[in-house]
Swiss-Prot record:
Catalyzes the attachment of proline to tRNA(Pro) in a two-step reaction: proline is first activated by ATP to form Pro-AMP and then transferred to the acceptor end of tRNA(Pro). As ProRS can inadvertently accommodate and process non-cognate amino acids such as alanine and cysteine, to avoid such errors it has two additional distinct editing activities against alanine. One activity is designated as 'pretransfer' editing and involves the tRNA(Pro)-independent hydrolysis of activated Ala-AMP. The lineage of its organism: Bacteria, Pseudomonadati, Pseudomonadota, Gammaproteobacteria, Alteromonadales. Keywords: Aminoacyl-tRNA synthetase, ATP-binding, Cytoplasm, Ligase, Nucleotide-binding, Protein biosynthesis. It catalyses: tRNA(Pro) + L-proline + ATP = L-prolyl-tRNA(Pro) + AMP + diphosphate. Consists of three domains: the N-terminal catalytic domain, the editing domain and the C-terminal anticodon-binding domain. This is Proline--tRNA ligase. It comes from Pseudoalteromonas atlantica (strain T6c / ATCC BAA-1087). GO terms for molecular function: aminoacyl-tRNA deacylase activity; ATP binding; proline-tRNA ligase activity. Its main location: cytoplasm. CDD domains: ProRS-INS (cd04334), ProRS_anticodon_short (cd00861), ProRS_core_prok (cd00779). HAMAP family: Pro_tRNA_synth_type1. One of its GO terms (biological process) is prolyl-tRNA aminoacylation.
Length: 571
């Protein structure tokens, strides 16, 4: 491809509203252009990368036995009403009406559509298992689109769905798709982790997310330094301490703590470490077994953070987790938020495992500006239930018993689920089994963010000059930069000959034939991230050589022109 016939569209300046490096570089390198909030046009360079990612995904889906289909983006509302998600989904589901005032949605996902399809197309167990996928544009009306294509409203996604008669069959396909996802990210050469995850609004049983490690990631993932264990921090179990609670050695004492509302303030005032205190959070839940609304106390060690997902799965706690208002706390407990503690509370108390082994700890006294020192479980706080309700921390023992946990940020680029019969039951999707009995199907669901992978790859592969593409998804393999070509017939001839040779050999090459200064040409090739650059200059031509530069390593070397085509073929 000649740059004179190409829409290169590079920019020198970094757009002010681009927060993360991938967004900045995708705009500067001419990969995308913003149309509106969360909506982007893919320019030729970006589309070449996007298509390469999609092709790798397609190849691995085909290898895993999945069949490609294409479903409508616009979906009738009645399918979503049948599944129950019409009411469950929030405003991120874009609801529209046609000219006949019938309700439709712009699809964020396709569980309902594919289930309806299989219900009508598959009638016998002999047609199972069935695994289908599509690569398609999705739309989710994000409340705050950000980070460019990483969290846009419109995005390209591969979603696959499998149908089975048994859990065993579903498990096998799930494992096959898990392996296929690993191959996708390995082929692109990304550092990633498959992690145990929560199913969220999709529903179902087993679930794994695939995260590309990057400082700009929105998710914290915990993984062992000695095994393959990895989990989203929301799902990682915080093991109970391997020691018993010490016996009390101090008297319960009230101390004045004026204006000390936070753990940090109380710890500083009383000169104690935060881990020797507890904090008490009040949430809404069932006050008794009659289902009446009341308050529940969640108690954590002072230096630990509440895991809302774990907390809302405890019997009696409302989901989604809802914090009590200041007025509710004042009415029930008689103090403000910063002075609450588990001693003498007349509401259910749930203590995290790490808090439950403390002795002689500091806590709120349920009086404004007053705390207890020397508080102890059973002696002072008599009624409580132990549970895992905190986030794990770096250095915690790994839940699989091997090594300790590290915490890193991750960008979610894939998610697979075992859905079970959630959608097939709702839409009555089943077949006659070998005994002639109607059986509802088990389902699996497997998503990859194709456009998000492009951004995630940049987050892992860049320097101060621009993008450093992994070879598998680079828009071009080789760039030809002829310095001052329009002033030298000799340089032009060598460049044209090399361009023709590489094209004939099937190499994707970007030939910079613009009338630009060499510095501009070099900067653009580095910004765009072409892995290999051939620089043609007068001085080296005197020795029948050209200069080769590797974008990733920065390595430079002189190559004899007669050996150049063979050299490029080895890259």
């Amino acid at each position: 491809m000649r740059t004179s016939q190409y829409l290169l569209s590079t920019q020198k300046e970094t757009p002010a509203d681009a927060e993360v490096i991938s967004h900045q570089l995708m705009l500067r390198a001419g990969l995308v252009r913003k149309l509106a909030s969360g909506l982007y046009t893919w320019l030729p360079t970006g589309l070449r990368v996007l298509n390469k990612v999609a092709q790798i995904v397609r190849e691995e889906m085909d290898r895993a036995g999945s069949l490609e289909i294409l479903m409508p983006v616009v979906q009738p509302a009645d399918l979503w009403q049948e599944s129950g998600r019409w009411d469950e989904y929030g405003p991120e589901l874009l609801r529209i009406k046609d000219r006949h005032y019938r309700d439709f949605v712009l699809g964020p996902t396709h569980e309902e559509v594919v289930t309806a399809l299989v219900k009508n197309e598959v009638s016998s167990y002999k047609q199972l298992p069935l695994n289908v996928y599509q690569v398609q544009t999705k739309f989710r009306d994000e409340v705050r689109p950000r980070f460019g294509v990483m969290r846009g409203r419109e995005f390209t996604m591969k979603d696959a769905y499998s149908f089975h008669l048994s859990d065993e069959c579903l498990n096998k396909t799930y494992d096959d798709m898990f392996a296929a996802y690993c191959r996708v990210f390995e082929r692109i050469n990304l550092e990633f982790r498959p992690v145990i995850a929560d199913n969220g609004s999709i529903g179902g049983n087993a679930s794994h997310e695939f995260h590309v490690l990057a400082d700009s990631g929105e998710d914290d993932i915990a993984f062992s330094n000695a095994s393959d264990y990895a989990a989203n921090i929301e799902k990682a179990e915080a093991l109970a301490p391997q020691f018993s609670r010490p016996a009390p050695s101090a008297e319960l004492t009230k101390v004045a703590t004026p204006n000390a509302k936070t753990i940090e303030q109380v710890s500083a005032l009383l000169n104690i470490p935060a881990e020797q205190s507890v904090k008490t959070l009040i949430v809404l839940g069932e006050a008794d077994n009659k289902g009446q609304q009341g308050l529940i106390a969640l108690v954590l060690r002072g230096d630990h953070q509440l895991n809302e997902l774990k907390a809302e799965k405890i019997d009696g706690v409302y989901a989604p987790l809802t914090m009590a208002s200041e007025a509710q706390i004042e009415d029930t407990i008689g103090c403000s938020i910063g002075s609450i503690g588990p001693v003498g509370l007349n509401i259910p108390v749930i203590a995290d495992r790490s808090a439950a082994v403390l002795a002689d700890f500091v806590c709120g006294a349920n009086e404004n500006d007053v705390h207890y020192t020397g508080a102890n479980w059973e002696r002072d706080a008599k009624e409580f239930q132990e549970a895992d309700i905190r986030n794990v921390q770096a250095g915690d023992p790994s839940p699989d018993g091997q090594g300790t946990l590290e915490i890193k940020r991750g960008i979610e680029v894939g998610h697979i689920f075992q859905l079970g019969s959630k959608y097939s039951e709702a839409l009555n999707c089943g077949v006659l089994d070998e005994n002639g009995k109607h059986q509802v199907l088990n389902m699996g669901c497997y998503g990859i963010g194709v456009s998000r992978i492009v951004a995630a790859a940049i987050e892992q592969n860049h320097d101060k000059y621009g993008i450093i593409w992994p070879d598998a998804i680079a828009p071009f393999k080789v760039a030809i930069v002829p310095m001052n070509m329009h002033k030298s017939h000799r340089i032009q001839q060598v460049a044209e000959d090399l361009y023709a040779q590489l094209k004939a050999a099937g190499v994707e090459v970007l030939f910079d034939d613009r009338k630009e200064r060499p510095g501009v040409m070099f900067n653009d090739m580095e910004l765009v991230g072409v892995p290999h650059t051939i620089v043609i200059g007068e001085r080296n031509l005197d020795e029948q050589k050209v200069e080769y530069k590797n974008r990733r390593s920065g390595e430079k070397q002189l190559i004899d022109i007669p050996q150049l085509a063979e050299f490029v073929s080895t890259l």
